[in-house]
């Protein structure tokens, strides 16, 4: 989400947005002032070039992993020498398949930390080459400065953890190599260059950390540190393969630990350098243990790190090196080759990421719309896209407005010229002057200027800590922008000077690639620094709109992508609205026909108007989804004030006319099945599709699935009217008796695009994944679809296309479960053939120990092997009959009570059914024939049957055996 916002600001012309105004429901958040953004820029660059956001992120993950593995290979090659190529390969594979690295990729999605892990072996490699004299010192120094500067911009926590390790390594190498003053000087120069390159980030990070609340530190003390330390039961994962889960603390793999111990035992010569690596391994491992808790809690740096298991980043560098020593212990080259193959193969098998159980939040659009980000914050409570609100300004004491007597709106006239997250340009007229607030947190770096050049001091006001400016009496042109603090500007210039120096030095030592990249960054950075703030012009509404609480000053419109219209109204609040504000945005074509209508609450349905203090200038936002296949042209926008039930409270207001680009045509699959079902009063299920290639049952249209496989149902919803709630949807797989065997319940639509964001006239896709449980018997399962209110669990009524109610859910056509099993082994063979349907292989019979008597029960198990499906669903009959005595027992029912009807039988399928029959209480004593057959329930016609010799059987009945019924006298 942060990456999507970064790309959004690039498109607005802002290269490095320290302040992100779209976060925290439009109140803003200084996330990129305190969170290192380098990997965000890599992903954002790919996305800007047209790669879907999820794809760009996956690509950067792969790039970082492979780059880190190559760096580990180079570092290990430096340490092991020319004879250690196999050992270096083992180290690279051990790094690439380190469980913590893979957990960061597949479980945590921690792209910044993965980027930092990729840099660590390269930094150590460059440091070693600098101190060991492998290259000209200037070349190694430039390389080290660039890599270490990149680390500072990649992951802040790793930057806290790694410098002590690097400093110790440099000193060890310097001492081991004869303590050269020149090499030490170049090392210090490289460290200084890295600090200068990243000064624009780390200087404000440290100097301005006091601008933030202490929530993150408090949470670290109370929760993060105590719950994320190792104890004796959580150090090592003993599973094969390694079990990747969300459980914390993260663990070492047993194979990792065994190889490390074996490698340490294999070291032939304990140089100072290898003793240092042993110390790093022991220190990092011990520091994650519960015994180190006082050290973590007693250090501000420890509290900032939050999770002690982040030291696994350092262990992910040292442990692979020990694995390489296991190979070096093998003296013969043949043994080393075998050892490399065995260790690499074992690492791949043991620590491979088995994470198919995880879901994905990737959006279907390939991007992350602003509205989706706002809704995510509101639904999860992760304001600022993080659980701890670690970058919340200290002036904000609450996220919900708490009125005070001094919070009043001064009488004033405001004519708005321009407004955006970067500032405001307005003409403010007031006889007495007064405070103008913005729906933005106060944070240092804002600058307020009047038209005559007078500077006003921005301050914080209200319990929210809103940005506020006291405007003097009279009529003034007020311009409020955010150029940043003086310290931020100074640190930025220090970075440019350092970068220019490194470009010159890199060119001099013939590092032309480094020099070229640095020169490009200088150019881009210079343009970013020289660029002024971009304030978006505001349009005046065609008709005035006002309530007792607020007035519409203007609006702006952006078509973010062809199918998504953003409307940004600007309000001035005279008094805090006491009732929930719901607005309807209607788009009409040139003939006056409605194209779409969306109804929602303020700021992408993430904020309440009761959070707006008096005297506040509100930069609001709404999303309107445009229907597929909309033609380009001019469209009219009307504004509706609605009550809680979406009923109009006053006549609609003409906002204006906007030119829209054409939207993409609707994509209809040939596998789409039409439905036209209405759910409640606002939603319609137009169609559904069973996604993925599915074999069809022979002679039928039934999809076939094996037990253990997953079905994906894609539903196509549309809104008849704007939904009043974010309904939850479900698809349940049920058996013939209605019992649920698998289900998927979630917020209808997608997590980032729930029902209340749906406008009319547009199809909304919704997917449900259902895994057929292992061991599910062959037969039919029915998917049942519905919607319900999450709080009450009350389902919405379902009506068909004629308006007739069909219940509170709808059963879709069934699927056939068919899993080939063991061959049938009946106790008694029969081999009777029912036409092209099936062969009755045989049966089992279990009689009471006392024999059959009137009223007693006995069990019959039938074994069929299907030859193909029947044209109709036949009924099976089992009769215990004698012509003279009549019927002693009878059972007529579809096979398996309808769970596996004959129309769904597949060639080769074995159908086994156990039946319980009861002898009639008034049955006469005597000998009866137990026989079975099949008939069509529509006309009663029995299916012809042949015996094993191919001869027709009389009355189309298969005689199984004769059973005697006895009387018992008391």
PLM regions and their residue ranges:
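Membrane-embedded transmembrane-helix bundle of lipid-linked glycan/lipid transferases
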Residues: 1-360, 476-481, 488-531
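Asp/Glu-centered strand-loop micro-motifs enriched in Gly/Pro and often flanked by an aromatic residue
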Residues: 47-48, 424-427, 556
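Extracytoplasmic
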Residues: 70, 309, 327-331, 339-433, ...
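Intrinsically disordered, low-complexity coil segments
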Residues: 80-88, 132-140, 146, 175-179, ...
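Membrane-interface loop/short-helix elements at transmembrane-helix boundaries
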Residues: 216, 425-430, 559, 563-565
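Extracellular/lumen-exposed scaffold segments
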Residues: 356-373, 386, 391-409, 455, ...
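Active-site-proximal, structured, solvent-exposed surfaces of multi-pass membrane proteins
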Residues: 401-508, 877, 882, 912
């Amino acid at each position: 989400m942060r990456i999507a916002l970064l790309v959004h600001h690039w498109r607005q012309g802002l290269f490095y947005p320290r302040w992100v105004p779209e976060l925290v429901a439009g109140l803003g958040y200084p996330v990129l002032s305190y969170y290192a953004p380098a990997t965000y820029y890599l992903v954002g660059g790919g996305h800007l070039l047209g790669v879907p956001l999820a794809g760009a992120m996956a690509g950067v993950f792969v790039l970082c992993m492979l780059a880190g593995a190559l760096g580990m290979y180079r570092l290990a090659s430096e340490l092991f020498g020319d004879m250690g190529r196999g050992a270096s390969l083992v180290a690279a594979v051990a790094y690439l398949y380190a469980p913590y690295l893979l957990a960061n990729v597949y479980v945590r999605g921690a792209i910044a930390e993965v980027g930092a892990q990729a840099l660590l072996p390269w930094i150590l490699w460059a440091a070693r080459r600098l101190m060991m004299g492998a290259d000209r010192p200037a070349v190694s120094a430039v390389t080290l400065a660039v890599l270490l500067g990149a680390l500072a911009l990649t992951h802040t926590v790793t930057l806290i953890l790694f410098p002590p390790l690097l400093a110790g390594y440099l000193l060890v190498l310097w001492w081991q190599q004869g303590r050269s003053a020149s090499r030490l000087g170049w090392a210090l120069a490289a460290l200084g260059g890295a600090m200068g390159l990243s000064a624009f980030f780390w200087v404000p990070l440290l100097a301005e950390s006091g601008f933030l609340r202490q929530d993150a530190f408090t949470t670290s003390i109370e929760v993060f540190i105590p719950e994320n330390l190792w104890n004796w039961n959580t150090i090592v994962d003993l599973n094969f393969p390694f079990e990747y889960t969300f459980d914390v603390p993260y663990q070492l793999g047993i194979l990792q630990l065994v190889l490390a111990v074996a490698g340490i035992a294999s070291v032939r010569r304990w140089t100072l350098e290898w003793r240092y690596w042993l110390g790093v391994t022991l220190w990092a491992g011990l520091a994650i243990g519960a015994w180190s808790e006082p050290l973590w809690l007693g250090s501000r740096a420890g509290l900032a790190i939050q999770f002690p298991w982040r030291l696994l980043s350092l262990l992910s560098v040292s442990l692979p090196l020990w694995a390489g020593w296991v190979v070096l212990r093998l003296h013969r080259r043949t043994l080393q080759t075998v050892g490399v193959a065995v260790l690499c193969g074992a690492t791949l098998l043991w620590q491979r990421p088995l994470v198919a159980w995880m879901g994905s939040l990737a959006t279907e659009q390939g991007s992350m719309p602003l509205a989706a980000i706002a809704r995510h914050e509101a639904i999860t409570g992760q304001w600022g896209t993080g659980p701890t609100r670690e970058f919340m300004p200290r002036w904000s004491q609450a996220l919900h407005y708490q009125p005070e007597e001094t919070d009043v709106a001064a009488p004033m006239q405001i004519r708005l010229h321009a407004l955006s997250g970067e500032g405001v340009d307005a003409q403010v007229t007031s006889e007495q002057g007064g405070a103008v607030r913005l729906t933005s947190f106060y944070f240092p770096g804002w600058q307020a200027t009047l038209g005559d050049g007078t500077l006003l001091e921005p301050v914080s006001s209200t319990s929210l800590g809103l940005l506020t400016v006291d405007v003097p009496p009279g009529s003034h042109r007020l311009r409020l922008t955010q150029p940043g603090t003086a310290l931020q500007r100074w640190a930025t210039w220090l970075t440019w000077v350092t970068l220019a120096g490194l470009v010159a030095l890199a060119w001099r030592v013939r590092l032309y690639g480094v020099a070229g990249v640095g020169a490009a960054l200088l150019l881009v950075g210079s343009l970013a620094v020289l660029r002024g703030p971009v304030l978006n012009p505001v349009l005046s509404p065609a008709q005035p709109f006002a309530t007792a609480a607020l007035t519409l000053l203007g609006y702006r419109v952006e078509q973010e992508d062809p199918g998504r219209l953003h409307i940004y109204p600007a309000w001035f609040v005279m008094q805090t609205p006491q009732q929930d504000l719901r607005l309807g945005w209607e788009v009409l074509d040139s003939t006056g026909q409605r194209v779409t209508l969306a109804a929602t609450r303020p700021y992408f349905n993430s904020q309440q108007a009761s959070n707006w203090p008096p005297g506040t200038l509100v930069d609001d936002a709404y999303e309107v989804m445009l229907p597929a296949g909309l033609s380009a042209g001019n469209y009219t926008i009307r504004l509706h004030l609605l009550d809680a039930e979406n009923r109009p409270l006053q006549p609609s207001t003409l906002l204006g006319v906007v030119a829209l680009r054409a939207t993409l045509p609707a994509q209809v699959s040939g596998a789409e099945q039409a439905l036209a079902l209405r759910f409640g009063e606002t939603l319609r299920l137009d169609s559904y599709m069973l996604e993925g290639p599915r074999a069809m049952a022979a002679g039928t249209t039934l999809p076939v699935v094996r037990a253990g496989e997953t079905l994906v149902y894609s539903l196509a919803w549309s809104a008849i009217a704007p939904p009043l709630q974010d309904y939850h949807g479900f698809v349940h797989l049920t058996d013939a008796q209605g019992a649920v065997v698998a289900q998927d319940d979630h917020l209808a639509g997608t997590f980032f695009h729930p029902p209340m964001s749906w406008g009319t006239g547009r199809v909304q896709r919704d997917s449900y994944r259902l895994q057929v449980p292992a061991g599910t018997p062959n037969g039919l399962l029915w998917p049942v679809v519905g919607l319900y209110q999450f709080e009450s669990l009350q389902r919405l009524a379902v009506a068909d296309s004629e308006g007739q109610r069909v219940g509170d859910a709808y059963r879709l056509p069934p699927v056939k479960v068919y899993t080939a099993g063991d061959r049938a082994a009946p106790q008694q063979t029969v081999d009777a053939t029912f036409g092209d349907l099936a062969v009755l292989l045989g049966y089992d019979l279990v009689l009471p120990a006392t024999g059959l008597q009137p009223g007693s029960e006995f069990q019959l198990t039938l074994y069929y092997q299907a030859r193909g499906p029947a044209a109709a669903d036949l009924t099976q009959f089992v009769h215990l009959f004698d012509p003279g005595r009549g019927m002693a027992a009878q059972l007529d029912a579809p096979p398996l009570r309808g769970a596996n009807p004959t129309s769904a039988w597949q060639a080769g399928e074995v159908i086994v059914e156990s039946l319980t029959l009861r002898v009639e209480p008034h049955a006469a004593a005597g000998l009866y024939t137990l026989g079975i057959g099949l008939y069509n329930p529509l006309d009663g016609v029995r299916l012809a049957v042949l015996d094993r010799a191919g001869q027709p059987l009389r009355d189309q009945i298969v005689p199984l055996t004769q059973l005697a019924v006895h009387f018992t006298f008391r």
